[in-house]
């Protein structure tokens, strides 16, 4: 009888191969240990919403102790890149996917599902020592086009100082928003530059009297959050309007009414082909508790009815 030799390394290699295939999770097959409130996943989030999603994630994981979500906060371009390359299955952006992006995913057997979760606004912030608190949307457009370069051109009584515009990141949704809104296809003028985050924008404006910063309003709108309150105390919000008589700050009521000119929506997008943890987290943020967190943050909930109250001064 012929004896067959046993190689003890073969079973180990088979197990390793199974683990590798499972980690790749081809065609979005549901892992055995994942459910809407259980599992371990990574998601990518637009850096503009770090304060908001730190709270959302803390609350969600406190309720569902078997859920572990590792969030990466990045500029919009990098968030989308993670999603399209299947590095993450769930993302947060300030725009929906394009037709071409959806078709690409569909060609790879993925259907992207978009949920609008909030209405946001881009705030223009200035140094507390700057007296120019009002600006028209077209004046800001002319600043980004290089037609206005000095604060005196905004207000003749202002100090004769150059305007230094600071964005959060060259790859951010904030930059894209204003390029699209004002149809700017070329480079911004040399007095416009980018740092690395919304927080760095706030710190730059705090230390530079002639600076004009652009951030998501949720960084300075939650007065019950110590970080947001500290930021708000270090800068001033500009009032923005379409004409000299009608202008407002990016407060919730004006965002809800779209009276404030620079409003946008916030989306959660999932490519899960099963009811996994990403789907569960999207449902939580779009549900009652998640929407209340959004309301508290200073943004406007997208799926929760809100009531606007007018307060008159007699």
Q: Which residue ranges define each predicted feature?
A:
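Residues that act as N-cap/strand-start positions at coil-to-secondary-structure junctions
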Residues: 1-2, 109
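Bacterial N-terminal signal peptides that target proteins for export
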Residues: 2-11
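Exported/periplasmic ABC-transporter solute-binding proteins
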Residues: 5, 23-65, 72-77, 81-84, ...
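Bacterial N-terminal signal peptides
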Residues: 10-22
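Pocket-flanking alpha-helical
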Residues: 77-108
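Peptidyl-prolyl cis-trans isomerase
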Residues: 96-100, 109-112, 131-136, 167
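Conserved catalytic cores of soluble enzyme domains
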Residues: 113, 117
